[in-house]
């Protein structure tokens, strides 16, 4: 019984770590794409109006922002890994029924703020 508990904990912890690392890789890739897009947009916009601000900033491993003058898109990777509740419709699929560990997921939130509200 004790071995079963240890095996389950090891498998679950390992899966959660894998999901965390994959989510972090995706967030790093997302930051690179956001920076490239912000730079391209800025180059085009500045030719027409130098007063329009378009900028990218990274706030570390978990947060990035793109500012479009009066609006800011904030991207935030949650540091926890979650699992779907058992009554969620995806848990009824063959894919998750075959392996319940497939119900774990990472979260990257995207928020849209008025830039003045972030000062």
Model-derived regions, located:
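Contiguous, amphipathic alpha-helical segments that mediate oligomerization or scaffolding
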Residues: 4-53
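Hydrophobic-cavity lipid-handling domains and compact docking modules
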Residues: 55-119
